[in-house]
Every structure is written in structure tokens, then in C-alpha cells.
């Protein structure tokens, strides 16, 4: 029997909450590939649960900024030089320099997973000098790639056109968790009021222009609702301050990042999931966020903005409504109108449960395995 190629997958994020890299590593391991997943450990990271594949986490002095990215790539590069691997899998542009250079020296194959339109994220578009550095790296490295994939067809098409690289698509759909793996939580366990309709807003990267601020401001007009944020991100603390300053602490609560099983348990207790990304940059315009599929897997309807990839899923599977106006009163009105028709909510829930049978990792992972099997 031929031995499977050894794979090292590198990502700059926290391995505890990055579901995409976990799903990929798990599927590769189950397919017989020896897998080592390399990431980082923040000071506030949760303990890493037991996983069937090998894991290595780097601790660094810096947690953000140029020194952090430089230190991570240097550490990763030196680490990769000491390890045997046939395939090096770079997750996003911020690991690709180290991965590509190590692969060039060692003769390994490079596979690239672009989780987003990296150089168009607002954190970079608002800082043109930093963006220019990353864009130069992208222009230098991407044309050299032979094995690449991304999260949706819109982003794949942009990269194909710009760099002439045949990007495949592996969507960000979740694992189908067995019922016994999901904690048996109730609203009472979480101390949620029993007489409120609950809106959930997920995200490990709740950053600027994700619609979180608008959701909070809409709560001024929704006194019989509860808004639950689950996750973290660049604006998470600012959101807490805004809720406090507006006196909305009885209507808006914040939960930290959760393990996937706990996140699923919390999400399915909500009535509706919110996906309110704004079309303020190319990355958001063409995004297909994890939370959309997490809501569907949890069997709850979705209220989403009209960014193309999200709208396509919501309308194709009829799992929710599309809101076009995020001004506080307008958004609140849309939410109230949504709940004014119990039959519609019930239909959306039923459709979400049906869509979950198709929009899950068991179906999607075959695309990843095909890319790895035919890596050049």
C-alpha cells in the first residue's frame, strides 16, 4: 500500500476557534494523510481540545502589528525547515511567505487556501501603506502557485482573472455534529429571559462594517427582543461600551468565543441568526461567512444583507429574509415584520433543516481531498 504524503498545514489564527482549518485537517487525517497543524497560541487562548491529528502552537511576544507577522513567519519558516513534509498547506496570505520559501528550499509541494480576498479587508484598505506591502507579496507569490482554492466562486474568479491561477472552491460549510456531541443547553442555563425573542450574531472576527453596530442600534426599538453576540473581534470591546452607554445591557449580551459544539448548542436556542456584512469593500462584497452556514446547521432562519454570495444561498434554499436598509429604525422594523408572520418563520426553519443535509462538510470535503490528491 502506497504511503500517503505528509502534510503540514499552517495558519496564523487561534486553532481553538478556527473551524475551517480544523475541518480540513480532520478530513485529511481521516483520509489517511499524516497531518500536522501549526498555528498560534494567544495569551487568552482557550485550552486546545484533544484532536486526532498532530498540533503545534507558537507563542510570540507580539499579538498584532508588523512585528507579529514578521516574527510568526520567521518562526514558521525555521520550524518547517526542520520537519519532513511532502505538502505544505498555507492558510491565507499571512502564512504564504514562510510556506513558499520553505517549500522552495525543501522541494515540497505548496497548496494555498485563501479564506478571503485578503488585500481587500477593511483593516488593510484603511491603511494603504500596509496594504501595499501585502499586495506586493501577493503579486509575487500567487502567480507561482499551482494548487490553490478559496471559499466561493466570486473570489476564485477574481484571483483567476488577476493572476492566471486556477483557483478551486471549497466552501466554509460546517461539520454535521452528532446530537450526542452537542451540549444540552437551555435558555434558562444561559440566563436568557424566557419571554424574549432571541437574535444571535456569531463571529470570531466581528470587525468594522460587519453590521454589529447597526444591530445594537436597532435594539433601541426592540425592547421585547434579546440580541446575543457570540465570538470576538476588533470592535468587540467597542460594542460593549456602546451597549453600556446606551443603557441596553438588558437587551444585548456578549459571550466569548466558544468551541464548535458549544457554539452550535447556543445558536440553536436563538430564533433568528443575523448576517449583516456591509458592502463597503471587495472582501465583504464577495464574502460567504461561516456564520451563515452555522445558522443553517443549527436549524434557525437568517436575516442577511444583500451581498451576492449570501443572498444566493438565502434565496436558493429559502432560509430567511434579505434586508436592504440597516438604519436602526428600518432594521428594527424589518425584524418585527419578520416575526409578525409565524408561518413564514416556521417555513424558513424547516427549509434550514433540509438545507443542512446539503450544506455541510461531509459533502464539501470531497473537493478538498481531490485538490490534495492531485497536488502538483
Which sequence ranges carry the predicted segments?
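Donor nucleotide-sugar binding/catalytic pocket of nucleotide-sugar-dependent glycosyltransferases
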Residues: 39, 56, 135-185, 189-192, ...
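A short, well-ordered alpha-helix in the C-terminal region of glycosyltransferases
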Residues: 330, 337, 344-358
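Short hydrophobic beta-strand element within catalytic cores of glycosyltransferases
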Residues: 272-275, 294-304
